[in-house]
Amino acid sequence: MRLAPLYRNALLLTGLLLSGIAAVQAADWPRQITDSRGTHTLESQPQRIVSTSVTLTGSLLAIDAPVIASGATTPNNRVADDQGFLRQWSKVAKERKLQRLYIGEPSAEAVAAQMPDLILISATGGDSALALYDQLSTIAPTLIINYDDKSWQSLLTQLGEITGHEKQAAERIAQFDKQLAAAKEQIKLPPQPVTAIVYTAAAHSANLWTPESAQGQMLEQLGFTLAKLPAGLNASQSQGKRHDIIQLGGENLAAGLNGESLFLFAGDQKDADAIYANPLLAHLPAVQNKQVYALGTETFRLDYYSAMQVLDRLKALF
């Protein structure tokens, strides 16, 4: 019987602690978030986030944000699973029962059906639903996120601030930084400078990652030097004005692949073999010296999951 008062006191203390935590969390809201359309007020911490961008979704999952549904890309291709979700976080998406909104073409009706309290749109890229902004913003607070001009760590930090998951974002970045430091000690750099691309063999074209891209920034963090494009190279752009890629095709393809080593993001050995087999690229130093390296099909978009896989791949290669 003497335990009863102690038990009651323990319950009271636990209740006070929990209410204190809730009070602290509530004190963090509302929040003012600014994007290209102005300043938005989030009255409370989001509980039902819809990501119209498959690129953003991986970072939301990495910080344990309550993302309930996501846009998807073409299923069962080299970068996506049977749902059209990116392979590097496919398992996590299944565990958390992430719903697929649509494949490719955005749908405001599909978004509305999820009853979100926050909608995220990418500013550029093939997964951007920017054209539907006016419709989506009537459903729930809608934020436009640029991922093409920043590292995946900066994106993770930004999403942490938007969702109230700053702590989780900082923890993920710290975990990566620890592995990055270890990798830098281990890796022996191949011939420099390097060119980083996504190569499409069937179209004889490539998207080249710029120094502003998450991929380019990660390579520079590891000590790699990115090759500079030849002056006057006429490269094309699509999917809006983008900072992260330069599209190379035709006569510009060989001119743009001027690094001493080539890194193939979103590619495997078959893609490396296709470059070696392309007679128009046979004169490139990286091809002649067998310095073409595939970094894995899970690396099309960089987030916490794929960045860790890139580290593992580079350690295995070098």
From Swiss-Prot:
GO cellular component: ATP-binding cassette (ABC) transporter complex, substrate-binding subunit-containing; membrane; outer membrane-bounded periplasmic space
Compartments in which it is found: Periplasm
Inducers of expression: Expression is regulated by iron, via the regulatory protein Fur. Induced by hydroxyurea.
Keywords, sorted A to Z: Ion transport, Iron, Iron transport, Periplasm, Signal, Transport
Matching InterPro entries: ABC_transptr_periplasmic_BD, Bact_iron-sidero_bind
GO biological process: DNA damage response; ferric-enterobactin import into cell; iron import into cell
Signal peptide: 1-26
Matches recorded under PROSITE patterns: FE_B12_PBP (PS50983)
Keyword Iron: yes
Entry annotated with the keyword Transport: yes
Fe/B12 periplasmic-binding domain residues: 48-318
Lineage: superkingdom: Bacteria
Principal subcellular localisation of the protein: periplasm
PANTHER family named in the record: FERRIC ENTEROBACTIN-BINDING PERIPLASMIC PROTEIN FEPB, IRON III DICITRATE-BINDING PERIPLASMIC PROTEIN
Subunit structure as annotated in this protein's UniProt entry: The complex is composed of two ATP-binding proteins (FepC), two transmembrane proteins (FepD and FepG) and a solute-binding protein (FepB).
Family in the record: Belongs to the bacterial solute-binding protein 8 family.
Entry-linked NCBIfam families: PRK10957.1
Summary of the function given for this chain in its UniProt record: Part of the ABC transporter complex FepBDGC involved in ferric enterobactin uptake. Binds ferric enterobactin. Can also bind ferric enantioenterobactin, the left-handed stereoisomer of the natural E.coli siderophore, and the apo-siderophore, enterobactin, but does not bind ferric agrobactin.
Name the record gives this protein: Ferric enterobactin-binding periplasmic protein FepB
Species this protein is from: Escherichia coli (strain K12)
